[in-house]
Amino acid sequence: MLYFAFGSNLNPAQMAQRCPGHVVVGLAVLREHKLVFPLTSSDWGGGVAGVHVAHGSSVWGIVYDLTDEHVAALDRYEGFRAPGDDHNLYERERVWVELTRPDDGSIPRRVRAEYYVPRVTNPSPPSRRYLDAIIEGARHHHLPDEYLAALGRIPTID
């Protein structure tokens, strides 16, 4: 499965722990969306990342190629049981993203990838620890400087 990560799953240490052996396909951008923090996590002590439609905005991230085992592990971490399950914290949806620096020239510029969408909203600013995990991943994957700067301006709960 192609998976578009834009939150803490950008962080290489977190992804290595959750999905050992995952494959990075490339840097990608989701157009006409913005990064938001629509769900509060007790594990992270604040809001966790999601995206909302927003004209003129973009969300940067990474596309990973995940095995079925990786997907099952990520589903557990993200609170996804099965499509439409009332106990899901998130649903998985598919979205078109643009690969800006694919690792392999044979990969199409636009790909359809899955991402996690919160089922309910309980917005909160992120914790400093959570935002730092995103920023560390964004730096590791060389997301654009202006996007890194925007991440650094996000207010935190602490």
Model-derived features with residue positions:
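Glycine-aromatic micro-motifs
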Residues: 1-158
